């Protein structure tokens, strides 16, 4: 039997981790696009 509060904590932590990971990847791609020298 799973403890509901444990499940909530785990899912919250997981979504925060995933959100942060996706956000950083997105941010890095944006910086890479903007940082290209146009010569």
From Swiss-Prot:
Keyword Transmembrane: yes
InterPro entries in the record: PSI_PsaG/PsaK (IPR000549), PSI_PsaG/PsaK_dom (IPR023618), PSI_PsaG/PsaK_pln (IPR016370)
Keyword annotations of the record: Chloroplast, Membrane, Photosynthesis, Photosystem I, Plastid, Thylakoid, Transmembrane
Subcellular location: Plastid, Chloroplast thylakoid membrane
Superkingdom of origin: Eukaryota
Bilayer topology: Multi-pass membrane protein
Single GO biological process annotation from the record: photosynthesis
Function: Not yet known.
Family listed: Belongs to the PsaG/PsaK family.
Name this protein carries in UniProt: Photosystem I reaction center subunit V
Species in which this protein is naturally found: Pisum sativum
């Amino acid at each position: 039997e799973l403890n509901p509060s444990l499940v909530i904590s785990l899912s919250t932590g997981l979504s925060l981790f995933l959100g942060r990971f996706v956000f950083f990847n997105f941010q890095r791609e944006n910086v890479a696009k903007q940082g290209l020298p146009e010569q």
